């Protein structure tokens, strides 16, 4: 039986890789360097998801809102630290590699589309998933507005030769659900990520799954 979806585009952070601890460590290191308040790791679940610029904006004290010079300095410091430490605690969610291999064996084409800077996203995918599992990896670049705006998703689909009717976007946050819908795709939310089932359902997810096995069955039409 043919798979229900011929192409699947995955978010990265909170969907296939658990990057939260390293993102939080980089944010708190940057805050500590300035004598600013730091945050619990779990608080970063709601600071990530819209790219590094938004993440930095969210952990900077409110008194620096609108201070472009301080923002650029803080962003550079965060990027430098994260670039050196992005693999300290990061790893794939249990069952993810097996799920991806099952999908590929069934002929499903896989891609990654993330708001993480491309210079960080591409090496992480290479390290943890190799170069063969994903046909395309697209991180944040200046040429496109970030998710959930449609242009970057449409670009990925064009590169893949994907049909919207048989393409699924998979992620762990409201941003991801909107990313799929804004490009005319169905969106599946994964409850094991940073945000959880309630946010995904409120965002209008077409599907919400709790395990990698459940996601594979959905994609394969089982």
How does the language model describe each region?
Residues 2-98, 104-106, 119, 131:
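N-terminal helical cap/lid subdomain that shapes the substrate entry/recognition surface
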Residues 11, 19, 48, 112-113, ...:
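Small/polar loops that bind or transfer phosphate-bearing groups
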Residues 13, 30, 77-88, 111, ...:
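Hydrophobic, well-ordered secondary-structure segments
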Residues 16, 92, 110-113, 169-170, ...:
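Conserved SAM-binding loop
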């Amino acid at each position: 039986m043919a798979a229900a979806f011929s192409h699947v585009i995955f978010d990265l952070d909170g969907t296939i890789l658990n990057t939260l601890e390293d993102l939080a460590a980089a944010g708190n290191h940057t805050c500590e360097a300035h004598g600013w308040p730091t945050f619990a790791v779990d608080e970063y679940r709601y600071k990530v998801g819209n790219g590094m610029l938004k993440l930095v904006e969210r952990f900077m004290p409110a008194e620096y809102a609108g201070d472009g010079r301080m923002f650029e300095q803080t962003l550079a410091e965060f990027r430098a630290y994260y670039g050196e430490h992005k693999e300290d605690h990061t790893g794939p969610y249990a069952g993810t590699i097996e799920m991806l291999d099952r999908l590929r064996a069934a002929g499903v084409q896989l891609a990654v589309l993330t708001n993480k800077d491309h210079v960080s996203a591409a090496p992480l995918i290479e390290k943890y998933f190799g170069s063969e599992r994903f046909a395309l990896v697209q991180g944040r670049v200046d040429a496109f507005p970030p998710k959930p705006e449609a242009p970057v998703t449409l670009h990925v689909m064009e590169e893949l030769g994907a049909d919207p009717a048989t393409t699924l976007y998979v992620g762990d946050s409201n941003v991801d659900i909107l990313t799929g819908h804004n490009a005319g795709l169905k969106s599946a939310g994964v409850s094991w990520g940073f945000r959880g089932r309630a946010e995904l359902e409120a965002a209008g997810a077409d599907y919400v799954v709790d395990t990698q096995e459940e996601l594979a069955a959905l994609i394969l039409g089982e």
